[in-house]
């Protein structure tokens, strides 16, 4: 379970999130929609630990993230969370297989699992290729495969299909949902697409007043 308790975040004197509280139940695929600039990406960054709130807490399975030391917090995020962000990164000096296998470096099944995920996102047989050989949309699919490869308990996705054509996007969203449900995991997906939001169990709208059912 993920709980947000009175999160507040300001940038340059502008309050983006104010005393936001919400409980995300385990195993639910939740889509978050809202107007541009309302703080959707900021919210994901706070949950992911990429930024810190000015006040309030992110609580994972009853443990406030702020109570963990850096090593423990990093270990929790690496083992229990998967991330797909708009500014995704792949390592240019590693092959696609190596990029996808990064979360599984200590796992003997890393190679097979990475190849299986590449196939699942439509890149079967491309594991030995390097990022420079791929288009932007293909690189995004590599980032999605990497986010799912270690079967995270919670997936955080910010416009995960933004650079993909509608047909490919639909396939990727079906894959996300299937992986999440197969593993009993949860997901929080920020999207502006109503078609993408329809894949979720629950759709929330983020406004200046907080989160509410869409």
Predicted regions and their residues:
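Conserved switch/coupling elements of ABC/ABC-like ATPase nucleotide-binding domains
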Residues: 208-214
